[in-house]
Amino acid sequence: MSSAVEPPPPPPPESAPSKPSAAGAGGSSSGNKGGPEGGAAPAAPCAAGSGPADTEMEEVFDHGSPGKQKEIQEPDPTYEEKMQTDRANRFEYLLKQTELFAHFIQPAAQKTPTSPLKMKPGRPRVKKDEKQNLLSVGDYRHRRTEQEEDEELLTESSKATNVCTRFEDSPSYVKWGKLRDYQVRGLNWLISLYENGINGILADEMGLGKTLQTISLLGYMKHYRNIPGPHMVLVPKSTLHNWMSEFKKWVPTLRSVCLIGDKEQRAAFVRDVLLPGEWDVCVTSYEMLIKEKSVFKKFNWRYLVIDEAHRIKNEKSKLSEIVREFKTTNRLLLTGTPLQNNLHELWSLLNFLLPDVFNSADDFDSWFDTNNCLGDQKLVERLHMVLRPFLLRRIKADVEKSLPPKKEVKIYVGLSKMQREWYTRILMKDIDILNSAGKMDKMRLLNILMQLRKCCNHPYLFDGAEPGPPYTTDMHLVTNSGKMVVLDKLLPKLKEQGSRVLIFSQMTRVLDILEDYCMWRNYEYCRLDGQTPHDERQDSINAYNEPNSTKFVFMLSTRAGGLGINLATADVVILYDSDWNPQVDLQAMDRAHRIGQTKTVRVFRFITDNTVEERIVERAEMKLRLDSIVIQQGRLVDQNLNKIGKDEMLQMIRHGATHVFASKESEITDEDIDGILERGAKKTAEMNEKLSKMGESSLRNFTMDTESSVYNFEGEDYREKQKIAFTEWIEPPKRERKANYAVDAYFREALRVSEPKAPKAPRPPKQPNVQDFQFFPPRLFELLEKEILYYRKTIGYKVPRSPDLPNAAQAQKEEQLKIDEAEPLNDEELEEKEKLLTQGFTNWNKRDFNQFIKANEKWGRDDIENIAREVEGKTPEEVIEYSAVFWERCNELQDIEKIMAQIERGEARIQRRISIKKALDTKIGRYKAPFHQLRISYGTNKGKNYTEEEDRFLICMLHKLGFDKENVYDELRQCIRNSPQFRFDWFLKSRTAMELQRRCNTLITLIERENMELEEKEKAEKKKRGPKPSTQKRKMDGAPDGRGRKKKLKL
């Protein structure tokens, strides 16, 4: 067994048989002093009231009889009596465990508020008449008098002893299999908590069966204590199905129900299932609890079990406040992660469990001296003593000997050429930060870190990085990412070995890329992330775990797939990227490394070499090592260690920057996968050896005291370099200059939009300011160009050679020849230039031009009347004149492609509005009373939220108000609120204008499809009928004669 905090439960009687036994009245309270581990432990007698007596077995309601509701109408005396008995036994038991509890119990008794408004939600406080007893019990400085001792002995002898139960084998009510030895010990520990009126935390490492031990406890309550419920189990939404299946599998006699669904489904469940009371255990999620809190408050709960208990570590959170308001006899917290954040969060959990003991956070913090706790061994021991009665934590390596080991290998990969370009671009954007010249804002640093991590995963996570459109799924998906290259080599080897793989990533868009990759390589896969619906989530897990499953890969987001999921059929875990918190990655590994696993689990962690990822993983490894050194039993870590300072983030960003800047070539090699794995295993072993030699002080500072340090990189000690960082700076790579091509030489100089070249070619000091959108005659630009060339000749300007042009020497020669042969403007040309300067739209500025373009986009190029109204300060005649010239000479504009695309997008929207209006007119026109008769052809897109009556109203009212009217959806929302038809339809009345718009867009799409189908059907029927038959007049009339008259037939 681990050295984890495992408290000694009350010992069984001496005559306890191998099966569960009961010590009745007159049984001795002393005996073998064996705890759950069989070691010596102080005996705790089974005192009166430590469990409900026979008279206390009566339920608040007749739990088994149908038709009776469990709704609480008034306080139940049995319930209150049980609470008072538990309180007295709790104090007595805790004081026998350690005298430290006198510190908490005594002030708690003194400080109990009398006003209900001042009481914190949770368990009832100690009454006034109990204060004196607690004070005398807590005073250990004076010996008791003989009289006091006699009175205590008399009181003890007058108490009726209660039944104590201890299992030495798996209970008979557990049907599907048998509990393992350590699970039986865990069940006994939970039972001892109940018998002593103590609430606790079951903190076994993930995969050790906390779910089964909890279900066994509730089964014990029903079969041995005659308390079937009501119990509540509060779990993450992702594990609801797993909990329900575990109840049915292990203890089928427990009637479990699950509260989940939308508003209507929940209301029906409460009415038909919850209130009638034909159940023992209600399993629900955190979200459902918050939504249905008013219903749950109506019950006197026996056991409240909270899975993933860290959700209530903040006592001010909404969930934490709500669960404290429930009436509960016993509370149990489950967590697979260490209590690692800070002492205040630990107090929050203890306050939830025992608010009458731990009622003051300030007193708790001062007692353990939060700031110095980890450095004071006595305080650490004191913390262990306080935790011992409440916390049970065991580790796989100690209790589950049959579980194969887990082997982790760090695989270091290089950057591809595209990744280096994007990595460089990100660093260059914030080069001032790298060189400590800019403002070091924490959010800015976090953003840089996030962007660099995206680049390490795959450059296609950035918009515009992937070549296309059209987008293709082929080898470029692999070659442009170093991690994908290694993955493409690793997966075929694993498939050949018969392994099955879990791939975890922090980013769901990485899963999108992996999904395309698996389809391209024909790997069968499942996927699970935070957006996966609950039903699909369970279907995927079942499909992957079923016998002889053909699914090879299961890709999961680390946060969504890291809790409450059993994927022990996989034996390989690939961490595509690493989390800041090492516990999150450990939870991901435990999806496969858990009870039921028969193979050695191999974990491959991908790390991009010489990047920020190296520092993130190193920091996580050090933090994990520190967790194992400091307070191993309670797993408490100094709260400051979780915070990343700005200096540390800067060092992470700077790491490898010079290496990335030094080259643009890919670092990906053609090394085979066996060589990559061998090299990774070697580096992993070296890192583990360094960590094992590190002292606690080094771990706290995330530094190494050994000669070989992670800060010693390529022969340089970066700790020493950090001291002189202000004198050094990272030299950015040389900037690549873009060649600036233009049709006209003048616009190359006068209308430059790209980066100016150095040195910039000189221009005459007094040049007229002309813009291309003013549409001056082309002759003017020829004269201005001639003037510029002559000016450069007069100052002796020499054209520099541009290194970016392929024929730089020839271009330089031609440009210089123009300057050398330039002549000044003569009088006629000067006069012509002045005349031409008056022939453009000189009174149109950039603002007028932009308004003109936006008006064309809004109304379309042909609606000149509305366009003229949009351009401020211009008469309709001026706009009409400008519009005519614009459409005639628009190709002279420098950004004409961008401008035309903007206008055409607007015109497309106009056409779309027209087609939608036509579709609505056609649909509404088919009915005389559309508000009552209109039917919508949903097909398979009905949806679950909106009814047909609601959809009918939305379409008809949208048509009535006018689809293209401004703010039409705000008016539609107001119409819904004013309509008596929906006065009780809270769902529809609570929709926002944006939600109504989305629903209307869906309905319009359905209507357009319906109209199209009807038109095609009508065309087909017309074609089937053929042309209309000709008239039969020829039978009665004769053919026309030569003058065009018809002859009559002679009869």
Swiss-Prot record:
Catalytic activity: ATP + H2O = ADP + phosphate + H(+)
Biased composition (Low complexity): 39-53
Sites bearing N-acetylserine, chain numbering: S2
Residue positions, PTM N6-acetyllysine: K439
Binding site for ATP: D204, E205, M206, G207, L208, G209, K210, T211
Chain ranges for the short sequence motif DEAH box as given in the UniProt record: 307-310
The enzyme's E.C. designation: 3.6.4.-
PTM-bearing positions, type Phosphoserine: S65, S115, S136, S170, S754
Biased composition (Gly residues): 24-38
Principal EC category: hydrolase
UniProt keyword annotation of Hydrolase present: yes
Pfam families named among the record's database cross-references: HAND, Helicase_C, SLIDE, SNF2-rel_dom
UniProt biased composition (Basic and acidic residues): 68-81, 1034-1043
One GO CC term on file: condensed chromosome
Record keywords: Acetylation, Chromatin regulator, Chromosome, Hydrolase, Isopeptide bond, Nucleus, Phosphoprotein, Repeat, Ubl conjugation
Feature: compositional bias, Basic residues: 1022-1033
Assembly and oligomerization: Component of the ACF-5 ISWI chromatin-remodeling complex (also called the ACF/WCRF complex) at least composed of SMARCA5/SNF2H and BAZ1A/ACF1, which regulates the spacing of histone octamers on the DNA template to facilitate access to DNA. Within the complex interacts with BAZ1A/ACF1; the interaction is direct and is required to slide nucleosomes from end to center positions on a DNA template in an ATP-dependent manner.
Record's protein name: SWI/SNF-related matrix-associated actin-dependent regulator of chromatin subfamily A member 5
Native organism: Mus musculus (Mouse)
